[in-house]
Amino acid sequence: MQSWVNKLWYQSHPLRFALWPLTLLFGAVSWLRRLLFSLGLKKATKLPVPVIIVGNITVGGSGKTPTVIYLIELLRSHGFKPGVISRGYGVEIEGVRSVLPEDKPASVGDEPAMIVSRTAVPMVVGAKRVDAAKHLLAEFDVDIIISDDGLQHYQLARDIELIILDGERRLGNGMLLPAGPLREAAWRLKSVDQVIVNGGIAQSGEQAMLLEPSKWLPVSPVHNGSLPPSQSQPLVAMAGIGNPQRFFDTLQALGYCVEQAQAFDDHSAYSETALNELANGRLLAMTEKDAVKCRDFAKDNWWSLAVDAKLSPSFDKQLLAKIDRLVADK
C-alpha cells in the first residue's frame, strides 16, 4: 500500500488527476477552517508558556521526532524545562495520558515511546492537544511546550512554528491530499518561523539539518553482550518509517554489508514470529522507532542505530533569542 501511494505522490502517476475533485474539496475545507481561526470566529487557546510546533505540510515521516529530541536537549542545556505533547498516532487514547518509560508503543504511539525512552522528558498524549497541554502544565514542572506534530491543529495557539521537510522528497507532486502528499498548500512554508530541511539541499532561507548516526544500541533490554554490527558482517536491515530507503542508504553509506533490506509501512506492528523468520538467525538492524516495538521479544543480535539531529549554531541562536523574548512577554 505504501509503495503504491509513494508512486502516486512522488512520481508522475496519472491517477492523481482522477483524484482532483477530492483534492479541491479537501483544499476548500482546509482553507475555510484556517480562515475561521484567522478571523477569530474559532478561538485558539493561548497558554501561559511558549509553545513550539514541530510539524510538516506533507503526510509521512520527515524527521520530526529527531528534531523534537534535538530541541529538548537544546532547551535543557540553556536552563529551560521543556515538556512535549503529541497525538499518539495510530492508538486510541481516551482523554489524555502521561507517557511513562515503561509504556508500550501500542498504548501511547511509536514516537512518544521513543522520545520518552531517549530523553525521559515529561510528555502527554491525547487527541486534543489543548487538553494534553493543560494536563502537561498541571502535572509537571514545565516552562515551555513542544508539540510533536500538530501544525494543522489550530485550536492550540502557538508562538513558534517549525516545518520539517524531507529534502529528497520535498513536496512530491505538489498536490493536496488525496492526489498528493500535502496537508496544506505550499504557501504555508512562507508563513512559519523556520523551514528545516532533512537531507537533500536546503534552498535559500531554509535551515539544513543532518541526521548523523551516533551509536548502535541493543534492542533487547536484557542484552547479553554480543558485539554490535561491524562493516565486515552481513546483516538484515528493516525499517517501518516514512522513508525506509533513507535508513538503508545510511547503512550502505557507512560501509555496512546489507544482505537483505525489508521495508514496512510506517507505524507497522511487529510480531516475534515474523521478525525471527526475517532475520533467520542473522544480525538484524533497525531504526530506534522500530526498536521500541520489539524490546519484549528481541534477540541478542538485534541492534538499532541511534541518530542525532544536527542543526547550525545560527538556528540555535535565532530560536533561543525568540524564546527569550517570548518568556519576557508572557
UniProtKB/Swiss-Prot annotation:
One of its GO terms (cellular component) is plasma membrane. One of its GO terms (molecular function) is ATP binding. One of its GO terms (biological process) is lipid A biosynthetic process. Pfam families: LpxK (PF02606). It catalyses: a lipid A disaccharide + ATP = a lipid IVA + ADP + H(+). InterPro entries: LpxK, P-loop_NTPase. Keywords: ATP-binding, Kinase, Lipid A biosynthesis, Lipid biosynthesis, Lipid metabolism, Nucleotide-binding, Transferase. Pathway: Glycolipid biosynthesis; lipid IV(A) biosynthesis; lipid IV(A) from (3R)-3-hydroxytetradecanoyl-[acyl-carrier-protein] and UDP-N-acetyl-alpha-D-glucosamine: step 6/6. The keyword Lipid biosynthesis applies. ATP binds at T58, V59, G60, G61, S62, G63, K64, T65. It is an enzyme of class 2 (transferase). Its EC number is 2.7.1.130. Belongs to the LpxK family. Transfers the gamma-phosphate of ATP to the 4'-position of a tetraacyldisaccharide 1-phosphate intermediate (termed DS-1-P) to form tetraacyldisaccharide 1,4'-bis-phosphate (lipid IVA). This is Tetraacyldisaccharide 4'-kinase. The lineage of its organism: Bacteria, Pseudomonadati, Pseudomonadota, Gammaproteobacteria, Alteromonadales.
